[in-house]
Every structure is written in C-alpha cells, then in structure tokens.
C-alpha cells in the first residue's frame, strides 16, 4: 500500500490539511484502518429484516456486506463476496431466502455466511472436481461482529472494538434512546450522490456553526438559529456528537439582520405554511437534534421528521448518502401525514438540506491545487469537548481527533 503524504500542522485540530480530501493513498488506508478497523459500521435497521431469511445488502466503507436474520432470530453479517472467484453472493438490495447461491459458479452459503456447497465438488463421472484436501469450513467470506442498539444494526470486522454501548458512550446512548424509544417503520427512502469526499459531508453534519448561515429556510422560518437555546455534545473519543436546539417563538432576535446575513430573508415565504405545522412529541422541548456516530451514521429529529442517514465513500471525490425516513409503529393517520409532509424539509432536494448536497462539492472544487494548505477550524476555540452554545466547530474538531487516532496520525507531543 502506498504511504500517504498528509502533513498536519500545529499542536491542535484547528488546522486540517486540504490534502486529506484528495490524497488517494490516504483514502486506501481509511478502508483498512477505519472501516475494517476498530469501529462499528451502521448496516441497517433491525425492523428491515424482521423475519428468518430476511436480508439486506449494504457496505462497510467500500466492502459489500450481506446482513441477514437466521432461524435462531440472530442477525448475521458477512462479506458479499464469493469465496471462489470474488463475485457478489447476493445481487438484490433486499429479500428473503433460505440460503445464498453465487450466480457465477453456484457455490452456496447458509444464512450465517458458511460455505455449504460447491457445484460438482466431486467432479463429473470421476473427472475433475476439487482436491480431496479442500475443506469448505476453511473457505468463506469474512464475517463481521454484529451489535444491535435501539433497533440499529452495526457491524465490525474487529474483535477488539468495544461493545456498542461503550463505543457510543452514555450521552450518545441516551440521545439515541430519546428518539428510538419504541418500534419504528420505514416510510420512505432516498439515495443521494454527493460530489465530494465523504469527510466533507460528515464535517458538515457535525458543523452547528453553518446550519443557520447556509440554510435560508432554517433561519427565515426560525427553525434553527444560533441564538436559540441549545448546545453541542461531543463524546470522549470525539467521533460522536449531538447538536440540539429549541424553538422559542417569543424571543426577539435581530442578530442576523444586524449582520446582514444572507440566510435571513423576509421575502422568502411558503404558499403552504402547513409544512411547518406539527405536533409535540418530545417532553424536553427539543425541536431539532442531529446525532452522528463515527464513521458514517446520522440520526435526525427535525420537528417531526425522523430519519437515519448512512454515509459511504465511493471514490476520493464522491460519496453516497442513504436516507431512511421513519415513523413510529403506533403513529396515528394524522401523525403519519405530518411526517411524510415534513420529509420535504430534509433530503436530497429538501427545503433545508438541499444546500448540503452542493456545498461539499464547492469545497472539493475549491481546494484543487491546495493540498499543502489548511482549512481553519477555530470557531469556539481549539478544544473538542461539549459546548453550551452552537457558534462553535468543537464537534468538527472532535471528528478529526477520532479520525487521526484511527489513522495513526495523532498529534505528536
């Protein structure tokens, strides 16, 4: 593997080399040290594979994965790669099966990923076949450890990664439980192609500073302003975060007008204001919560719009974002209508998040030829801890703290 030439400058995580988003050798190392390393990769929802034989195909980084429930009701995950010649084992996005068979040479696997059958293993009429020394038990796709937390299914290639609860930490666990405290149903899906390196989008998710500056909808309709009550939680590793806020319609705030911020635009109006009409369902008054888990999982609650997002790298300058919109299984008909309508707020063409799908590409294009220069990530200081305010980049610095540890690029004393 070619060695990365990334050079970090300074004694903090406030300077990030632009080359980190364009260096192909570094991207190759990410696959081994992060996605196949000591992390928990989000794979799917437990409710997406409710019965024996139900499966989904997904990815851990670039590695294709099969996730399936067996007759023992346990969930198993293994590489979607035939042990014979490397073809995909499962071609469908989802389905139900008693077993898997590769279409190329008909090698078969059970629902736990064990190789169970080799076509013409003994040959034909005494000719050919596999050698007597061939042992099916010694061949098969690599298997992942599986952990389920609040209906979220995670997988890891590492035997050394902590339990999912310890990996997340108590504050992140509590905030996931806050949203996923009862059974959910999938009510919609999108897959979005992003014209940028995966890290640019994950920074964006963690960046509470940008939200009311980039997104006109957030600011104009006062769904999210930095002046609102809220805060940022960063776990001890730095890799996981929560940003949250509460709408206060009675609070007068002219700070955006005073600074002539573009995103505060009184001429921007809705023909159908019912889009903003919802219902109270969380006793803490939090109207927006964005939660991320390293390296690529997001859980959102924006008003009554609940969704999970899975971020996957596809090349050095492109990534894929899978959106899965959720409702609670006990939603009333009216509540479900509200969730479906508010799905227009957040998504590839959402009134709020459409800009996020573009701005990463603006950065990817803007840093061409600047690999030896640095991004400045100093809003709110140089620490990576939790914050009572959201005019900060603390959780972005936390991401780089975790990233550098996994990549072996920590700051030198």
Swiss-Prot record:
Annotated positions binding [2Fe-2S] cluster: 82, 84, 102, 105
InterPro entries: AhdA1c-like_alpha_C, Rieske_2Fe-2S, Rieske_2Fe-2S_sf, Ring-hydroxy_dOase_2Fe2S_BS, Ring_hydroxy_dOase_asu_C_dom, Rng_hydr_dOase-A
Residues annotated as signal peptide: none
Cofactor: how bound: Binds 1 [2Fe-2S] cluster per subunit.
Cofactor(s), by name: Fe cation; [2Fe-2S] cluster
GO terms under biological process: phthalate metabolic process
Domain of life from the UniProt record: Bacteria
EC number(s) per entry: 1.14.12.15
PANTHER family: CHOLINE MONOOXYGENASE, CHLOROPLASTIC
Protein name: Terephthalate 1,2-dioxygenase, terminal oxygenase component subunit alpha 1
């Amino acid at each position: 593997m070619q060695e990365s030439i990334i050079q970090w400058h300074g004694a903090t995580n406030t300077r990030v080399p632009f080359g980190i988003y364009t260096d192909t050798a570094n991207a190759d190392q990410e696959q081994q040290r992060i996605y196949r390393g000591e992390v928990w990769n989000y794979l799917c929802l437990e409710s997406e594979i409710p019965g024996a034989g139900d499966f989904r195909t997904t990815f851990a980084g670039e590695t294709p994965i099969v996730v399936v429930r067996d007759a023992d009701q346990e969930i198993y995950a293994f590489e979607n790669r035939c042990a014979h010649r490397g073809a995909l084992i499962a071609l469908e996005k989802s389905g139900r099966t008693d077993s898997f068979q590769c279409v190329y040479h008909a090698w078969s696997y059970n629902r736990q990923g064990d190789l169970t059958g080799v076509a013409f293993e003994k040959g034909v009429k005494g000719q050919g076949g596999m050698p007597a020394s061939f042992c099916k038990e010694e061949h098969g796709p690599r298997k992942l450890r599986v952990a389920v937390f609040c209906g979220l299914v995670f997988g890891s290639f590492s035997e050394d990664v902590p339990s999912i609860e310890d990996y997340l930490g108590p504050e992140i666990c509590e905030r996931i439980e806050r949203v996923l405290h009862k059974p959910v149903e999938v009510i919609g899906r999108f897959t979005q192609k992003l014209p940028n390196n995966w890290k640019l989008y994950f920074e964006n998710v963690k960046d509470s500073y940008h939200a009311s500056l980039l997104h006109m909808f957030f600011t104009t309709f006062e769904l999210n302003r930095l002046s609102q009550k809220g805060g940022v939680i960063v776990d001890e590793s730095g890799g996981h975060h929560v940003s949250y806020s509460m709408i206060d319609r009675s609070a007068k705030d002219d700070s955006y007008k005073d600074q002539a911020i573009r995103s505060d635009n009184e001429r921007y109006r809705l023909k159908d204001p019912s889009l903003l009409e919802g219902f109270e369902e969380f006793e803490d008054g939090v109207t927006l919560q964005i939660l991320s888990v390293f390296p690529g999982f997001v859980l959102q609650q924006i008003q009554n719009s609940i969704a999970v997002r899975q971020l996957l790298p596809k090349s050095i300058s492109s990534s894929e974002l899978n959106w899965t919109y959720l409702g609670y299984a006990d939603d009333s008909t009216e509540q479900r209508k509200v969730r479906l309508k508010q799905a227009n707020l957040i998504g590839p063409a959402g009134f709020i998040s459409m800009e996020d799908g573009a701005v990463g590409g603006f950065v990817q294009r803007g840093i061409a030829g600047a690999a030896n220069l640095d991004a400045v990530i100093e809003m709110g200081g140089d620490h990576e801890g939790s914050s009572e305010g959201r005019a900060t980049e603390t959780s972005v610095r936390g991401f780089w703290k975790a990233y550098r540890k996994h990549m072996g690029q920590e700051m030198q004393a």
